[in-house]
Amino acid sequence: MRRLILSQTLRVAGRHRPPVAMFLQRFYRGHGISTALPLHYSKRHRKREGRMYGKPLRPVSDGENGASGDGGVLTRWEAVVSSRHQCESPVQTLAKSEKPKKAENTVAGKMTGSSRFSHRRDHSAYPSGVQPAPLATSGLPTQSSERQQQKQIGQQQVPLDALHRLFKVHAVMRTNYEALGKCTKVLKSFSTACAEALLQLGVLQKEQPSAMERKGFIDVQLCKSRVTEASKNGTSSPCFVLPPESPLYRTTIKFPTITVEHVLTTTVPAGCGAKDSGGDIMSVDMEGAAPFPMGHCESRPSTSAGNGVTVEYDCEGDVLSHGAAWNSIIEGFGQLALNLKQNASVSDFAQLAETLAYFKWVKDEEQVGWGTEDCVVKKFREAMANAKDTSASGSDPNTSDVSAALAAIAESFLRKIPRVDCIGSAVVHRGGERTAPSVHAIDVMLNLALRMCLSQWHAMSHFERMNIVLFCTYPWFAEDLSIAAGLCLTQSYLQSLLRADADVTYQHTFHYVRRVSRLCWPCIHDTDSAPVKKLLFPRDPQGTAVSSHALEAVSVEEKDNQLNQKEGLQGEEQATTTSESKLMWLPSFKDASCVSYGSSMKQRAAYELLLLWMTCVNPSGLHRSSPHGRYVSATGIAIIDVDLFVTQRFRTGKSKDEWLLLHPVEGDVVASVTIRTMVQHCETPYALTRLFFCNFHSVLPHIWGGIGARRREIIWTAWCRAVAQPLVNTLSGSDEGQREDDGGMQTLQITVDNADRTLDYLKPLISALTSDELFLRLIMRCADKSLEEMACEIGSGNNTLPLSKWCAQLAGFVYSVAFALHCRAKREGCNRDGGPSRPNTATDSANKKVVSGKQTDNLPKGTQEDISDLQLQFKAAVSALLRKLSAGDTQVAEQLLHHFYEPHFSGDQEREVVEDIQRHLQQVCDSQSRDALHAWIECSARASCEATVPLKEELLCKWQRTVLEADAGLPVVLPTIVECCRGLVGLVKKRGRNISGRRQGQQRGTESTTVGEESSCKEVFSKEELPVVITVLSRAMLTRTSTVSTVGLTKISSEISTLLSSCGYETADGNTSGGGRNGRELCDTNTATITSATAGERTVELELILSGEIDQKAGELPWITILEAVQLQLVPYTVVKNLLTSFKGGCDNGKERLRWQELQRDFQRKRHHRLVGNTLVFRWYGCAVPNDEGWEDGSGLMRPMAEDRDNVHSASHQGRTSTELGAFTRRLLKTLARAEVTRLDDRKEITTQTFVVGPSDDSATRHPTPGQEEDANLQRLDLLFRVHTLAAHILMTASTKKPHMIHELYDTLLHLVERVMPTTPNAPGNASDLLLLWLVGSAVAVGLRFRPNFLIKWPSTPEVSSGNLKSCPSAEEKTVHILRDIEPYLQSELLRPTVRLRFVINVLVALRSLELLGARIDVEGLHMDQLLVRASADRRLLSRHVNLFLIGCSALQSTQSSILHTALHLREAKYNLSFAEIERAFVAIALSADTFARQHEALMEQNYQQQQNRTLSVTVAANNTTPALRVSPVQLRHAWSALGRRVLENAGESPTDLFVRGLQCAAAVGCIDSALYQQLLSYVVEFRWEDLHILDWVMILRTVRQSFENRRNLEAYLKEPLQAFMLTMTDSGDNSTEQSVQKVNLKNHEGEQLLEGLCLFAEALPGLFIGDRELWGLLWQALGSQWSACFNAASNIEEQQRITAWLQEINASYAWAARAAGFRGLDEPTAL
């Protein structure tokens, strides 16, 4: 019913409104605002909202760390007011309010109705029916008149209409002030409204200036100038005055004086007193208990002395709850106070105080003249500039003087700020005019509002108290109220937490902590904080604060006391700057005032108040609401921030006399014990942070995922700083405090003695966390993630932290895990045994489990997985850290070793806890990391003990140190090739040599000679500097080598040109992201030398200078330097013969031997030197690898360099040089092999790979840095070349060394191959084909034979090899094991879509060799023939590598048919083929023809069997005397014909073997009866018969007998030459000399090969000749003569015995041949 009547009333009221009002009504209604609500409805609504005031509408944003002091929370009431007036102008706002009839004639009513305040119109209007307070007209008022006045006021009711109107409009006026660009008219209107409200209350009075003389009255200001001003008509306006002896200024505002004792005795939670155990914290149940034991207090009276106020209280009550303590603030108000309390709520005064505080800052800024030329900022900066000038002049400024000057300036600045509770003194202006003291209307109203709020302290809500306390921290009062206000707020908040019906949320906690931390605002002496820097130092043109050197000199703290800006205390309530000048960086007036008002005493008080609150708080009181992530995290960050700031601010420790609030209380045992416990707990730094984790540990796991990453990082860093780092220092046995660099500031560590080192500071935390499994898992998860991020960040190279900081962080992470595991183990022990007990070592040893190679306790599955993950991350972090250490960082490595593996605790207490933590520490720290640390320390010691020659040049000294560290095995960053060239070019120019780089092509030869002449007369590098320069260049070039095929083939100038071309391409595209390592390396150096167009020519000149220096000093340089120069192609390889020539003669043999021994030691100890030697051997001594020029079998020096081939030498000179170079190369190979065999055990070898102890799948390995990739590549190349060296040495010495020595070398080779396989990438260029070739070639040389059933079948699933080589008993099984390991790499490369011809050929050759060793090969599934066909499709590739292709076609039976696709190419390119390639083509064609013939025969036999024609199947195969019909493809016959003509055309130059291969190939393709065959045969018989040996005749006899048409003619033609050959054999055998044997054996065969040839010759003769007894007798004589010659040429009895055994074979062959010819009487000759 009431709602209906109200709605009707609203409709009627709407119809009678004027058009303007109707428009406003529609406007507001369209914006969701009701304008027709009656006044009483608004008042009820406001009262209801006041009761709900305790709950703010919006949460604190994630980035909000605190707001400015004028209201940090938007309440529901403010939201309603602001929403109703957000679209209104000031005029509309004032016109909108209705004009109640009862207030129509009042001043406020006139102001509202006319949209103007009353002082602009009728100044004589006073409230009707209300008589203003009487004014004193003469003299000072007497006591009787005052009492009469108070009596009169008490008898009448003071109206509050103006005050209520002010309550309604103050928030809107503040909004309008900001919306209108800080309009001064709004400020003046607000001041007038305040004055009128005070006038209505009787606090102020009005008078005419022309009235009687005022005595004792104080003028009240409304704006910057006084109110009295002339109006337009010349009349004077009345002014507001404050009567003398006003109760507002009779006493200053003070808080009731309480002590910490009061707080402790009135906030003890029920049931949390000391137990029967005497208050042992370890036995206290932390759920619902305080961190420290506190006893129960009995009721007793006490007196708090302070400011003359005596208050009685007991333990059940609170001094703050008594009205007497607070009523003293409004003493003398009388009936006015009662009237205000009854008719105005405390919420209205609190909200009004917020607006008053806001406008007070505004008017004070104008009154002080902030931003003018005489601003106090100028004085501050002048003082700092004077200190800076003093420091720059060389003399240190007096710190105390500078500090005193800053304090004096700050004090004078604070005196200019008007106080709220007292009247300022008279002010003397510049002109000598003395102005009477005055007070501003805003100050008076703020005084009244604060007194009314404080007098009703117990009635205010939580957030209202926060705001009032905030105002009390500003410099607005006669006395500093900050500490007293904070203490009162702490006690009130603790009591609200302890009440059973209290509705306290985490939001309340956050606002309390933020308000208390407001006391910790930086003072003027904290010159390293952001607000103080902004105040003291100007801004540079770039907009950043000038870094003054005087900053360190003038600070009253220590030089390293820097505020951690990452955790944001200095910016918690930082306001934005209000104005900015071009010449100065002007801070806000509010910031400057707070900085000037700050003090170290307040900072200590903030710390102690938070410590008191965290100590007394009941954790269960924080759990009455759901945890809010933002508020909880913001609370923790604020506590952590204060703890960090105060701990670093007062680093000298807090003795008993230095505590501000926490003093032991005499007579109160309970409070004294509690305070003493807190003080002892704070002896270890960061106690406040530990208390935060004690109270909030159960909340953090639930909010952790919902807060920002930055907040998580701050909280986790605080845990490591407050818990982990003190634990590290305690267990490590540090004798004195350690300081670590914490984000640019020094933090104080534990400073207790060894004898007093205990873990008491961790007891509360251990007790709290024992039952919280979620928080322990959170700690372990954070540690695991931190370790992973550390490994990535260290490996990325982008970190800027010092190594000591990384070491401290790593220790903190690991010790956090050990601490969490200790708490978890303690909880499990309590659950099993009902209480903590010492672990039983006997039982534990029986319940051990292996976790990642470590013996750990019988842990749950989840714990084992956590420890395994942590072990992997710890390995990766240690590896990354070791890679960053240099030789001078030995202390860091020793510190890591000391922290993790050698902890020492010298205290006698808590031995059980310490041992348990150390045991869990060893579960995370594995033995591999310990071995790596020890190895690194040994390498560092080796590097420091290395003898070096002192150099004068700084750059060369740096390179020398880097080289020494690299040779010692330390992971260092070597200079790149670009950096080396840049440094050397600059050094050469510095020493007077001009490198212009502007030569023309036609002048290069002349200038090269000039450079050589200059280098011969002027020395650029000394003999001590040249080895350093050459080795740095050599290392840089090897670093850029990626595959085996590119080692040693590129000059320095060519590499620089490659870099230039790649950089130019990237620069043209404008994109450097895809340039790879080359582009990044060039762009990182940022050198003009390389980026210029003449960089390549400058590098060529540099090469010429270095070549000349090496030529001059070759005899004085170490041999390894000469080898490095050869590797760099600075000098030719022939220079090594000079080294041998200089030592010719008996007197120098000892010196030469010493040189070789020194070189061998270098190969043993230094990887780079070994790599250089192996590179040269690989390039100059090919081993068992087919190439384009022929088959290299490693029998001598094979490959001269390109420049050597261009030189023209005589034949004798070439032979002599080749012999000398071959001798040096073989000696070098022998030295390398000996160094490899005599080296230490591989496990003791120190290389940079030893330090990579992390897992193979960790983040650092998945994303390796360029330095790690280069080092891993060099390590792999070193292993590959070592395998090649051993294989070459085995092949070279297989016939000369003893068998057991060869087997030892082969066993070493197998172990090296096993080591290199894990480093082989599954990518092109992995050199697995070379490994297979070298392995198989060594096996052939050793004489290895496989078991008959050994099968190699590809493709196949790789078998998992069991064990290692040590488990294989024989060399055969070890070889099979290695072959199984190589197979996956070979198959994956063969299955790639792109065919690599050289790789395929190497694999085919190796497989053919395995067939010779007895293995069965089945590679049909890989279609090797198709790979060769695909390769032959590229004609250019086929032309370059035709020899390799022919070798591949000849390797296996399955690939022999591939020659058909190249037959046409052989015909077309016959004139471009060399004789060796023609010979290889004849062999390939013959093998292919034989394969087709066998396939044809098998097909014919299969057809005959299918037709069941058994009789014909017998005649398919030809007998010894009947030639078989050869069926071969026509392509092969045409290819043979073309190549045969090519041989005949160059018959004079063609070797004899080439003719023999042509005849053999003709027989294979079925062209025996051709004219070309007869021409070839006749040329050989007629002109080359002296060069034919016995095996050549065997081949001729076998081919001729296959002729069908010309067999008889050929038989007749060959009879005479054959008899002549047998006569020659007989004559040479009769001489019985070695020369005759060698004459017959033109191919230099051994004796056994010659005897085998005799048997074959005898068996081949009856295939063509039947002959007579004369022929067979001649044959018998020839055989006997040759056998006798071989027997007589034998050098020992063993050879004679082997030759004697061949006699039976020769007899058997001769008897079989005679029987086959039909001469049975000759089958058993008696001549022998």
UniProtKB/Swiss-Prot annotation:
The keyword Transit peptide applies. Keywords: Mitochondrion, Transit peptide. Its main location: mitochondrion. It is found in: Mitochondrion. Residues 45-71, 88-156, 829-863 are annotated as: Disordered. Residues 1-117 form a transit peptide. One of its GO terms (cellular component) is protein-containing complex. Disruption phenotype: RNAi-mediated knockdown at the procyclic stage causes moderate growth defect and reduces production of guided RNAs (gRNA) due to a block in the processing of gRNA precursors. It comes from the Eukaryota. GO terms for biological process: mitochondrial mRNA modification. The keyword Transcription does not apply. As part of the mitochondrial 3' processome (MPsome), involved in the maturation of guided RNA (gRNA) precursors. Component of the mitochondrial 3' processome (MPsome) complex composed at least of terminal uridylyltransferase KRET1/TUT1, 3'-5' exonuclease DSS1, MPSS1, MPSS2 and MPSS3. Within the complex, interacts with KRET1. This is Mitochondrial 3' processome subunit 1. The gene is MPSS1.
